[in-house]
Amino acid sequence: MAELACFCYPHLENDSYKFIPFNNLAIKAMLTAKVDKKDMDKFYDSIIYGIAPPPQFKKRYNTNDNSRGMNFETIMFTKVAMLICEALNSLKVTQANVSNVLSRVVSIRHLENLVIRKENPQDILFHSKDLLLKSTLIAIGQSKEIETTITAEGGEIVFQNAAFTMWKLTYLEHQLMPILDQNFIEYKVTLNEDKPISDVHVKELVAELRWQYNKFAVITHGKGHYRIVKYSSVANHADRVYATFKSNVKTGVNNDFNLLDQRIIWQNWYAFTSTMKQGNTLDVCKRLLFQKMKPEKNPFKGLSTDRKMDEVSQVGV
């Protein structure tokens, strides 16, 4: 995750801003600079290579002292920065909202996946600039639309019905922030269309998840899609979701956290996010993740979670 201000800077033209991507030499100069504390939140002028991000975002970049940041000296960084600028330049961003726009925290891996989709001749985003723009605006939080199947970050499709598409996510070969853990497995479920869904199609998805992915928890980050994650990673997701939610509340970002369909979401996660939305502390909310919940009535007749041991899915073992 990183703020949009880590990729580009605003240049005032008439009454609105044009956004320009950073080059990696300007960022390198900023990373070596000694800057007064009062100037940490200001864009840095490298003198030679142009404008660089505010020094307060140093930890967002991979350096000898910080391996957890993004690899900004890659071609992919430039591609992602240009993708962001193209999207922002399609909007009218004024003095009144430029700060809120650039402080928006976005998913670096999601944006890299959009670049990968854009460069794939078999993908619809390769052929449609309008769809690419729409997908990018959703990814950077500048659209009220949710991420649906056609605007999704992409991945390998492992399940699809009339209402849902399930993607296997892999970041092993990413350039900006690869996940090098060979055991990493995560999935995302997107709605094919943002409209009411019949119980039949919900039941098909729930059956698939309980049958094939019973070693995973179904959660949401509040953005209109489902995530299927290992139970061992749930606490980490909770920390991230809570931090993002609080950050958005603090900065005044419109954050209508979408709890999604309670019949699909893991019961403990639904309790966690509902309590978070009520303004409770992280400790209070996370306690619900490890609490034994009273089993809910099965909303789908004939659909059981009871399986013989030899029938249990091996996905995620």
Curated annotation (Swiss-Prot):
Q: What is its main location?
A: host cell
Which residues are annotated as active site?
A: 225
Family statement drawn from the similarity comment of this UniProt entry: Belongs to the rotavirus NSP2 family.
* Xref: SUPFAM superfamilies: Rotavirus NSP2 fragment, C-terminal domain (SSF75347), Rotavirus NSP2 fragment, N-terminal domain (SSF75574)
Name any Gene Ontology BP term.
Answer: viral genome replication
Annotated region described as RNA-binding, given as residue ranges = 205-241
Known role: Participates in replication and packaging of the viral genome. Plays a crucial role, together with NSP5, in the formation of virus factories (viroplasms), which are large inclusions in the host cytoplasm where replication intermediates are assembled and viral RNA replication takes place. Displays ssRNA binding, NTPase, RNA triphosphatase (RTPase) and ATP-independent helix-unwinding activities. The unwinding activity may prepare and organize plus-strand RNAs for packaging and replication by removing interfering secondary structures.
- Which UniProt keywords are present, listed alphabetically? ATP-binding, Host cytoplasm, Hydrolase, Magnesium, Metal-binding, Nucleotide-binding, RNA-binding
Tell me what this protein is called: Non-structural protein 2
Name its co-factor(s): Mg(2+)
